[in-house]
Amino acid sequence: MNFHTKYWNPFIETMPLEELRELQLKKFKRALLWAYSNSPFYRRIYKEAGLEPGDIKTHKDIRCVPKVEKDMLREVQTREPFPYGDILSVPLKEVTTFRQTSGTTGTPVYHADSWQDMEWYSETWAYVLYAQGYRETDRVFIPFGYNIFVAFWGAHFAAEKIGCEVVPGGVLDTQARILKMKELHCTAFMATPTYVLGMADTAARKLGIDVSKELSIQRITCAGEPGACIPTTKRRMEGAWGAKVYDHIGATESGAWSYECMEQPGGLHVNEAFFLVEIEDLETGEITDDPKKPGKMIITALDRSAKPCIRFDSKDVIRWSGQPCNCGRTFRLTDGGVMGRADDITKVKGVLLAPTAIEEVVRSLSDLGNEYEVLVTKKGDLDDILLKVELLPGKEGEEKGVLAHLKDQLRLRTNLGYQIEVHPYGSLPRYELKAKRFKDLRMKGA
């Protein structure tokens, strides 16, 4: 690739829209035929729907292809052959890598990749990192456990592909990671938004280190949670580290489907060379291209071979921006990041509530700590929302005013009232991977 441009692949990333749509349709047809011909699972659901690969001739025809739900993926892996069931499109002997989902929404889903898939996966991530300014001069620290979750495996290989020097910090604890980043003058790292904030907090409280002044970090890539596209959370992270923070959203089932570029346009580019993203209206169930109208993301990985991902219902809620980006890429932009999961965006007291709205308010108050927890319960016939927060040390005397302001902002942002508990600083749960701060306990009889 040309390291003197701002694009990893200038030809693809600036391709005229009509040509890009033609490329996606061609790839979708190829992926559908591959799955139909080689995966008993996909062939079964397509035959049940009366669908033949040759039926797909236009982008609109794609909407007739049955969606795949996560529960379907869980069910198929209970079948023979172990451990994936009959979903694979390659012989088991061609599988080189096992991954699984984190299990935060239920039984983990197993995922298989071939060596060809892993090369593709690193290429999709190279688009992400290069757009965020990673170059061969960077020393990149990756502070994740290198375990069975996909997390930053692809990012590691992509950083190497770009030419970066990669420091794998998996076995180190948080304090050791910070010290190693300082020692090696690392210029970039990757983590969940929760862990980005947690590392800065640990550095200050346990090591007496101001990471914005004593480390050399210039850019941070976030994944796993919506936080890096929530303006107040992004500002906290950038303020704590004195670095640019970029969002990325992916999934084990699909791959690295989106990224924020260096322009930080307030949304994410869909990695359209490799993925087809559709948005399904939450109310009508129809596919919509209407900017500003949120819906569930239906995603197809256009080049995945071992375990195809065709029209997977991610349950992630996004919306199109409808605006171009100043970076010059023709890949479409979302408006903001992932707004939440369709499973989490729920009616409380008759009002639709997105957990990201609560995070945006909490993180906007400088007197509050980074951590919080939301519990939705039933008290008799009425819904009740309990929000647990932490005051920063030294702010105890300002508690009354802070909480009054917090309640006002929450009501303005969400049109709901909250019970608020203040907990000692450092007492709420801390997370390294995906944080589960929003808990709807109403269905559990709480």
Q: How does the language model describe each region?
A:
Residues 134-138:
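Short helix-loop-beta connector
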Residues 1-100, 106-123, 130-131, 381-388, ...:
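Nucleotide 5′-phosphate-binding alpha/beta core
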Residues 189, 298, 303-414, 433:
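AMP-binding/adenylate-forming catalytic core of the ANL superfamily
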Residues 115-128, 139-198:
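AMP-binding/adenylate-forming
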Residues 196-216, 235-238:
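Adenylate-forming
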Residues 35, 101-104, 140, 189, ...:
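Conserved S/T- and glycine-rich ATP-binding loop of Class I adenylate-forming
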Residues 139, 206-228:
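Conserved helix-loop-beta element of the AMP-binding
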Residues 222, 227-324:
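Conserved AMP-binding/adenylate-forming
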